[in-house]
A protein has these predicted regions:
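A recognition module on extended beta-rich or small alphabeta surfaces enriched in W/G with H and D/E
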Residues: 178-181, 248
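Extracytoplasmic thiol/disulfide redox context detector
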Residues: 2-5, 13-14, 18-166, 185, ...
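Short secondary-structure capping/turn micro-motifs that flank functional sites
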Residues: 156, 223-224
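Catalytic His-Asp charge-relay segment
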Residues: 217-218
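Short, exposed beta-strand-loop hairpins at the edges of beta-sheets
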Residues: 227-228
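Acidic, Ser/Thr-rich peripheral helices and adjacent loops at domain boundaries
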Residues: 164-178
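Short strand-coil-strand connectors
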Residues: 61, 221-222
Length: 249
């Protein structure tokens, strides 16, 4: 969606209505037909009635938006039920961003094990991302995790990251984890030209398909996703929840 839509600001819509499961309806079908006609080729998913009369929930790619019946005005933000004291949007958005771990091309990642390695997580990381470096410190503190590491350089932010990512991969299968750790901790680059066969371009394309907007980006065993660097306590809790296990170093 872009500037052509009448209302672009990120809006929180506060509802005093009781929330309920969204349902398909003739009205929702009509809104869907209107959106298809107005915005052909857009990644339009399901359209359902929201708890607010005249407002419809629309899955747009991996985003969740609200629209009125003419398809002109869009609301971006969270819908709250103030009677039930519930955020109606966040759980739906979390479902949309889920990624099944077994669908990831693990041959394009390398595994790093900290402690027992019982908890599993996939990580999309840019070696020049300061938040990724901060997350690595948190991983070291919480322990008991196996990290399937996908090198995902953000060229627009870190022009040197693509070369560094390729050098890390080209360090060789047994040395990739150590090469990554050394660069993240000390900025020590592997001693190679980064010219081997590598998955960096594939990882960038994979991230685009998964709508990954930045790094770090975590994918849990239960499919849940978590963008951004987490404090150690928050990371530990999220790893436990996404793996459904108790912490043990």
């Amino acid at each position: 969606v872009g500037k052509r839509f009448g209302l672009r600001a990120s809006i929180t819509l506060v509802a005093s209505l009781l929330g309920g499961a969204a349902a398909a309806s003739p009205a929702a079908d009509q809104v869907r037909a209107t959106l298809e006609a107005k915005y052909p080729g857009s990644p339009l998913g399901t359209v359902t009635e929201s708890p607010v009369p005249g407002i419809f929930e629309v899955v747009w790619g991996k985003n969740l938006v609200y629209v009125e019946q003419t398809g002109r005005y869009f609301l971006f933000g969270n819908l709250y039920d103030m009677v039930g004291r519930a955020d109606l949007t966040s759980p739906r958005r979390a479902e949309l961003t889920k990624v099944a771990m077994d669908t990831l091309p693990m041959q394009d990642a390398f595994a790093r094990v900290i402690g027992k390695g019982e908890r599993k997580v996939a990580l999309f990381t840019d070696p020049d991302c300061p938040y990724c470096q901060r997350l690595e410190q948190a991983f070291a503190q919480v322990g008991n995790v196996t990290i399937y590491t996908f090198l995902f350089p953000l060229d627009s932010l870190h022009p040197n990251a693509n070369l560094v990512a390729r050098k890390i991969w080209c360090a060789g299968e047994s040395e990739r984890g150590a090469a990554y750790d050394a660069y993240m901790a000390r900025g020590a680059q592997p001693d190679n030209a980064g010219q081997c066969d590598n998955p960096v371009a594939r990882n960038v394309e994979l991230g685009r398909r998964l709508n990954i907007q930045g790094t770090p980006y975590l994918i849990g065993m239960d499919g849940s996703t978590k963008p951004g660097a987490l404090a150690p306590a928050d990371l530990d809790a999220w790893l436990n929840a996404s793996n459904r296990v108790k912490a043990a170093r």
